[in-house]
Amino acid sequence: MDSLTSPLLPASATHDPDPMATPAEIAAVIALAHARRARTLVIGSGRTPHALATARRIDSTWTRAGGITLATITWPETAASWLRQATRFVAPAPDLWVMTGPTTGWAQMTRRLLWSTPWPPTHTLATATLAAPHTLTLVGLPHLNGLTGAAVDGTTWQVKNDAFIP
């Protein structure tokens, strides 16, 4: 696996769409968490209106299903380093992490997590907004092996063997 040469993206931030997760997508994220026998989650999201609403919906659905949310962490689309957010994201040591939000902020946060923390993609679930090939290549597929997520229709996807598997 090629190492990241910097936790920051080489290009400046863009203004990405801010889609809301569908009910089927949220149900699939919760089902994936249950299938992995998770009891605790940390939910991370961008700070856009739909990302925040999606994080709240995941939290409430998870809690109603008997799970425990240890923390909800947000990150900006642009920042100097994302180190503070990355440190707060991994500190509670949940069974699983869940991530949602616009592309650029997620990519920057994920690169910082890989660069500065013991965060493993194998213990992370993501929403459909993060499944686009151009999004995943901002971080690099070899760095995301094991990342699993839900599509808008409730089907699931995974990064495995350096490839996106729908």
For each of these PLM feature ranges, what is it?
Residues 51-157:
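Extracellular/periplasmic bilobed ligand-binding domains
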Residues 161-166:
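Long, C-terminal catalytic modules of enzymes
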Residues 1-16:
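Flexible loop/hinge segments that line or gate small-molecule binding clefts
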Residues 46, 158-159:
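Short acidic/His/Gly/Ser-rich catalytic and metal-binding motifs that mark active-site loops
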Residues 12-74:
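An alpha-beta-alpha
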